[in-house]
Amino acid sequence: MKIVGNTVIKPFHKATCHCGAVELELSLPNGIEKPRRCDCSICRRKGAIVGSVALDGIKILKGAEYLKLYQFNTNTAKHYFCSNCGIYTHHQRRSSPNEYGFNIGCLEEVNPFDIGDVVTNDGVNHPADR
């Protein structure tokens, strides 16, 4: 997905938390890939639409000291959020540990509501929990 609403997704697109303390640069040469929601316990609560990038596809431009790590259950996935404003920015995925999921709502000038319907992953019945 290379355009969301009127916003062209840049090959290197900036993402920020709400307060601006955390700034990321995402490598998105193919636009937003795999936009989705998840119905696991944490994703239901944060409600974000998420895209994916390779582990080397996120660069922290500023605010690394504001990023806090949250883990639960198997402690495999690593969820990061801004300790100042509380916004979830990205996570290292449990189902694909070679990828980060990122909060599409953090992309500069992108309104995730312009994406429309997206697939919802079954995080309640995650294969790693069987």
Predicted regions and their residues:
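A short Gly-Trp-Pro
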Residues: M1-T16, A21-R130
